[in-house]
């Protein structure tokens, strides 16, 4: 994109890669990518590196995205919009992404939320990896602002979700049990896609039963996949402790996950 003055002189240039794909959500059916039903094999990710903590880089984004692909996963979610270089890597490698309004607290007021939604959608709208918008995490939803996603995403109008909620045809209930409620899953009529399940952080072992959970959930024709918590343990290297990795949860220097 070139911006020129009245004399035709180029005064600003911006280059941006784009991609083409279709993404559709059908209630009581599922999510379709380029006309094919999508089962997300997802992971939740925080922006983190052992050496840099919350400081990120394009090299770190590439490393994480490649590792996620090598883990046979195809989808990523975070609690905030990621660095653009991570979305660039998702675009490039074929990973799909849930782009989420920042936070894990209560809902934003309407004015603040509206501003943040506009900033997120206008920045990320051209990334083909973004398949769903998320209006906040675990109770951070302000439904008064839901219509704004389509206002700024007026051509694709990607579906809006509320993680941890059964909302608008998509049940994203967090940490469902193996024998999750009959009404919710076995005899449910909503597309089922837990945006967090099998808490596997800090050696809790939550990921150990993945095969059993996955095989059971795949028996439901409305299962659309899910997102394990979490990609890595977020243990920073402590230069003041001889280089040990400190994963002491919320007591660690960069906070908990």
Region locations from a protein language model:
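N-terminal carbohydrate-binding accessory modules
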Residues: 1-70, 88
